[in-house]
Amino acid sequence: FTAPVNYDLIKKHYVFKDPEQQEKEFSDPELIAVLRIGNRSFLIGKQEAVEVIQAQPKFNVIYTGDTRRAPKKISYGGTTQTASVDNYSGLTGTGLSGGIQDAQRIVTGINKTYEVSVGKKTKRFYNKKSFLKLFPKKQQVRWNRYIEENKIDFGSVDQVFKLFQVSISH
């Protein structure tokens, strides 16, 4: 079926909107092989969004979110990130009651981890240093120079994919 789909980086699962525009999540995500969003393909990963850039040789991008607690509300409509107001108490008809507020979280950034096939093994990298570890020490100097000369940004999927293509052709 077709529905607007999004990935919730905080709860780490895919959500979609039904015809009444209510947000829902998949009850059996393991039954879904691939999600097609426009011309992009995503796998239902274990607590992660996995985009398939190329099947053979494998090149996937794993998206994860940096999260932190949302700023807490304080008096006069302000917010604070340093106040420690995590519990509350109140008077009820039967006595004193208390509890802990739910921790609200916000996404502060998105991390990209690249998953590739190197020979028969699957390897992951996320920056220049971890990319260079895919190669023997003798080749690392050459690839380090290539990355510096071409100003490869490991936050750009397109640039990293081109770097991977060049590296497997040599």
Positions of predicted regions on the chain:
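Aromatic-patch recognition
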Residues: 1-123
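Long, compositionally biased interface segments
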Residues: 123-170
